[in-house]
């Protein structure tokens, strides 16, 4: 649960001090509560250590981790459509006339409310790591929408949260393209065997290469034809493998076994100690990876 699978990275755009003790009280006002009978979705904070602690924050070495939980009611479109059509047909038969569009629209709301109490729920959890030393916030998710939703919850809890996506000086796709074209990457990194290339033109093609030597004539032809690398699988220090995306997101993080086993000497029964040790280890490695990536990709944009 703790080891992040993806990273959406954000920069605190103003100097603000985030302290776990203060955050604990602020998050408490927005703890997770399940959906009521008429709620489509609910989101709130839960302890990052799950049932092992009531604390809504966990902190070590200037790093804070928090966890958001979301419940969404699942109402498949065909189910809504079927119930709505049945209701429309009954009313039209009873009244001997065709219903207007506005009447049908209001009926749809009625149908939704009648179905909600019987709908299944889908639950998801999103971890967020706040690096107070480097002024960064990382969200463990693969989509900007999910990250923004979680940041919005934090903003609401704290009162304000001045953050922007981490921006780099040079377009990421141009740097990734040059790495593949030349076969030379930034120090500490190594090309793996997977990439996605897109044509610069909107209606151009997309090439997805898997299990393939990227420094090859076949790939070079696509680059010469004007395609740019938008996703690239990389290895860092033989410790972490990941896919770098042109939007700045880091996906499919895979920590090497040696790294993950580093805290194996800690008794697994002592969940709190193991969680703390893994958290310190993971955040230390990922902070170093992010710094190396930013430098390797040409540096952070001036703020």
UniProtKB/Swiss-Prot annotation:
Any one Pfam family match given in the protein's UniProt record, by short name: RdgC
Protein's UniProt name: Recombination-associated protein RdgC
InterPro entries, per the entry: RdgC
Keyword annotations from UniProtKB, A to Z: Cytoplasm, DNA recombination
Listed GO MF terms: double-stranded DNA binding
Protein task: May be involved in recombination.
Classification via NCBIfam families: PRK00321.1-1, PRK00321.1-3, PRK00321.1-5
GO annotation terms (biological process): DNA recombination; regulation of DNA recombination
Coiled coil (UniProt feature): none
The species this protein was found in: Salmonella newport (strain SL254)
Cell compartments where the protein resides: Cytoplasm, Nucleoid
